[in-house]
C-alpha cells in the first residue's frame, strides 16, 4: 500500500492506494467520527462492493443509499434522495457519508455531506479510474444544471480517500478508457516524463496490469495533491487541471449528460486545446499530434461531435466557472508539461479552433 497526503493544514488527509483495501477496517476507523455511516452508491457498483464494505464496517450502523447510475442523474432530484435517506434514518451531525462509486457518486455524496446539517464527515472510496485519479481528490463536489455542468456545488474535502485498485477489475472497458483521459492530462500539463511513461505503458494499463495501474494512479494523485495543496479553491494554478474541460463540458452539456462519458468529452476537448495551443504557436504540430495519438491508443474519441457548431460551443462555453467578467479563460499548453490559464488570445484563433476539421486531421495522422 502507498499513502500520499493532501496538505491542507488542519484539513489535510491521506490517500491510500493498494490492492484489497476495501477489506481493511483499520484504514477507515480513524476517519469515522460516530456510529452512523451512510454508504452512497449506485445500482451498478452496489451489487459488486456494497456488502463487502458493509462487512468491513461491522459494528457501525450502516445505511445504504443506492442511486440510479449515470451522469443523467447528477441532479437535484437524485441529491434529494440522499437527504431523504439520511433524515428518514435520523442521521445526526456525527454521521459519516461514504461515497462508494465513480465520479458522479463522489460528487453528489460529497455535496450532500457538505449540505446535510451544514456539514458532516465525508469519505471517498472511488471505484472507477477517473474518480481514483481525479474527482475523489481535492474536494470538488456538486451537481449538474441543465444549462451547465457542475455549476451547483461546494468545495468540501474528504477525511480520507481509499483507492482499492482491484475495483478496476470490474470496470467496463469504455469507463477505463475514460479514466485514462484524466491520467494523460497530468502528463500534458505538468509531467512530460510521465507522458513518455504512459506512451510506453498504455497497452498494459488497458490490459488492467495492476503494477502499471498503481503507478499511474500514484503519479496522478501525487500531481493533483500538490496542486490542490497550493490552490485549494482554484483561484490560480489549480485551474490548469481543467485542460480540455471547457471544450469537453460544452460537449457533455450539448449532447446530453451521459451520452458522452466525461473522460471521452475531456479527450476530444483536450485535442481542441492542443489544436488551439498549436495555432497560437505555443506547441508544435508534432507535439499536438503526440497527444492525439496517445488518446487514440487509449481508446478515446479525438474528434468532437460533428453536429456541434461554433455557436453551439460558444453558447455552452459562456456558462463556465472560468469565465471572469465576461471573459472566457482557457487552459492551454505553453509546452508539453506546462499549462497556463489565459484570456489573452485572439478571438479569431478560438473561432478557427472551433471550426477546424478534426476528422481530416486524424485521417492525416493515419496516413
Curated annotation (Swiss-Prot):
Cellular compartments per GO CC: cytoplasm
GO molecular function terms noted in the UniProt entry: 3-dehydroquinate synthase activity; metal ion binding; nucleotide binding
Residue numbers binding Zn(2+): 182, 245, 262
Annotated cofactor note: Binds 1 divalent metal cation per subunit. Can use either Co(2+) or Zn(2+).
Compartments where found: Cytoplasm
Record-listed E.C. numbers: 4.2.3.4
Gene Ontology terms describing biological process: amino acid biosynthetic process; aromatic amino acid family biosynthetic process; chorismate biosynthetic process
Catalyses which reaction(s): 7-phospho-2-dehydro-3-deoxy-D-arabino-heptonate = 3-dehydroquinate + phosphate
One Pfam family of this chain: DHQ_synthase
Required co-factors: NAD(+); Co(2+); Zn(2+)
Binding site for NAD(+): 69-74, 103-107, 127-128, 140, 149
Pathway as given in its UniProt record: Metabolic intermediate biosynthesis; chorismate biosynthesis; chorismate from D-erythrose 4-phosphate and phosphoenolpyruvate: step 2/7
InterPro entries: Dehydroquinate_synthase (IPR050071), DHQ_synth_AroB (IPR016037), DHQ_synth_fam (IPR030963), DHQS/DOIS_N (IPR030960), DHQS_C (IPR056179)
CDD domains named among the record's database cross-references: DHQS (cd08195)
Entry keyword set: Amino-acid biosynthesis, Aromatic amino acid biosynthesis, Cobalt, Cytoplasm, Lyase, Metal-binding, NAD, Nucleotide-binding, Zinc
Biological role stated in the UniProt entry: Catalyzes the conversion of 3-deoxy-D-arabino-heptulosonate 7-phosphate (DAHP) to dehydroquinate (DHQ).
Annotated PANTHER family: 3-DEHYDROQUINATE SYNTHASE, 3-DEHYDROQUINATE SYNTHASE, CHLOROPLASTIC
The family this protein is said to belong to: Belongs to the sugar phosphate cyclases superfamily. Dehydroquinate synthase family.
Family matches, as HAMAP family: DHQ_synthase (MF_00110)
Protein name: 3-dehydroquinate synthase
Gene: aroB
Amino acid at each position: 500500500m502507498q499513502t500520499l497526503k493532501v496538505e491542507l493544514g488542519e484539513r489535510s488527509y491521506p490517500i491510500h492506494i493498494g490492492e484489497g483495501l476495501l477489506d481493511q477496517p483499520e484504514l477507515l476507523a480513524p476517519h469515522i467520527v460516530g456510529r452512523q455511516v451512510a454508504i452512497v452508491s449506485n445500482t451498478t457498483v452496489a451489487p459488486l462492493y456494497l456488502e463487502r464494505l458493509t462487512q468491513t464496517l461491522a459494528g457501525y450502523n450502516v445505511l445504504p443509499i443506492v442511486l440510479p447510475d449515470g451522469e443523467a442523474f447528477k441532479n437535484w432530484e437524485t441529491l434529494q434522495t440522499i437527504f431523504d435517506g439520511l433524515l428518514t434514518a435520523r442521521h445526526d451531525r456525527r454521521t459519516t457519508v461514504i461515497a462508494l462509486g465513480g465520479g458522479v457518486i463522489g460528487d453528489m455524496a460529497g455535496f450532500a455531506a457538505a449540505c446535510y446539517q451544514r456539514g458532516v464527515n465525508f469519505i471517498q472510496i472511488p471505484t472507477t479510474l477517473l474518480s481514483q485519479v481525479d474527482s475523489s481528490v481535492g474536494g470538488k463536489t456538486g451537481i449538474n444544471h441543465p444549462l451547465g455542468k457542475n455549476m451547483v456545488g461546494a468545495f468540501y474535502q474528504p477525511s480520507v480517500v481509499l483507492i482499492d485498485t482491484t475495483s478496476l477489475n470490474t470496470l467496463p472497458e469504455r469507463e477505463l478508457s475514460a479514466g485514462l483521459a484524466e491520467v494523460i492530462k497530468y502528463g500534458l500539463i505538468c509531467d512530460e516524463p510521465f507522458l513518455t511513461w504512459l506512451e510506453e505503458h498504455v497497452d498494459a494499463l488497458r490490459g488492467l496490469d495492476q503494477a502499471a495501474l498503481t503507478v499511474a494512479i500514484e503519479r496522478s494523485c501525487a500531481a493533483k495533491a500538490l496542486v490542490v495543496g497550493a490552490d485549494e479553491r482554484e483561484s490560480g494554478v489549480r485551474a490548469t487541471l481543467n485542460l480540455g474541460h471547457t471544450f469537453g463540458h460544452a460537449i457533455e452539456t450539448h449532447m446530453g449528460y451521459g451520452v458522452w462519458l466525461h473522460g471521452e468529452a475531456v479527450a476530444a476537448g483536450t485535442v481542441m486545446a492542443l489544436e488551439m495551443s498549436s495555432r497560437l504557436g505555443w506547441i508544435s504540430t508534432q507535439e499536438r499530434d503526440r497527444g492525439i495519438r496517445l488518446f487514440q491508443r487509449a481508446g478515446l474519441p479525438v474528434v468532437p461531435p460533428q453536429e456541434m457548431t461554433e455557436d453551439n460551443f460558444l453558447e455552452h462555453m459562456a456558462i463556465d466557472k472560468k469565465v471572469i467578467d465576461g471573459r472566457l479563460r482557457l487552459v492551454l499548453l505553453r509546452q508539453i508539461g506546462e499549462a497556463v490559464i489565459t484570456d489573452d488570445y485572439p478571438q479569431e484563433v478560438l473561432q478557427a479552433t472551433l471550426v477546424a476539421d478534426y476528422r481530416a486531421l486524424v485521417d492525416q495522422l493515419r496516413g
